From Swiss-Prot:
Origin species: Vibrio campbellii (strain ATCC BAA-1116)
Residues holding NADP(+): 10-11, 31-32, 38, 53, 75-79, 92, 143, 175, 183
Transmembrane segments: none
Protein name: ADP-L-glycero-D-manno-heptose-6-epimerase
Required co-factors: NADP(+)
Active site residues according to the UniProt entry: Y139, K183
Pfam families, per the entry: Epimerase
Amino acid sequence: MIIVTGGAGMIGSNIVKALNEAGINDILVVDNLKNGKKFKNLVDLDITDYMDRDDFLTQIMAGDDFGPIEAIFHEGACSATTEWDGKYMMLNNYEYSKELLHYCLDREIPFLYASSAATYGETETFVEEREYEGALNVYGYSKQQFDNYVRRLWKDAEEHGEQLSQITGFRYFNVYGPREDHKGSMASVAFHLNNQINAGENPKLFAGSESFKRDFVYVGDVCKVNLWFLENGVSGIFNCGTGRAESFEEVAKAVVKHHNKGEIQTIPFPDHLKGAYQEFTQADLTKLRAAGCDVEFKTVAEGVAEYLAIQNR
């Protein structure tokens, strides 16, 4: 069995879909369906069982046996970069992750987890080293702290001549694609611009968006990276982006091209995001490629075209 936490979320449900396409359906999805809209992400998927996050965590902490587990994809987290309740964030993204990690280490279960490019902050160098990290919000900090916890475990194991089972962290950059309808304000720019045009409006970007550049990565490619590391058993913390920085304007142009209508308009940059907003991200893929992962990443033009063909059918 494979367990996917956050399996009703955007990345988690796409990982389940990718596993299904690889002929794997012995899957336990763990999530919190308080946001009932997320159920739609599971409707077309083939899974063995579903479990509530709190019930799952209780069983993990009790050391319960789930039977043979091939791997755990840990995608469950509070991913709202605008959430400032630090106690809530650290409990969800840090403490919960530690419990699950040690459960896996004790049983030598491969543990593949979601980190984030939010760990980098305002740097212009996106290399998986501590000197380049400096989160701008508590979400990024929760992910940064868990990465550092994993690093300490590796260091301790090395000093004692021990070999840990697989731990692989993925620093997701700006992920977009199908199954993000439930995310509200946290959904991708492509999602919001598409909705605006479908509502008969012009697509709207924040002022300055022609110079805001992010590494936008298509969720289908993210899943390919996850499955490659499961298959190859490589440990480490790796950037998961395209290696390209493209502007928000490029995303808007791709959405306009899909619809063949709409003129890009600008709106004022919101005060609540000032100082907590990454204006530039670009994954350094040196470490990913050195590990042997040869997944090719779609450009914004390619990814948005595929996404909207699915979204608008």
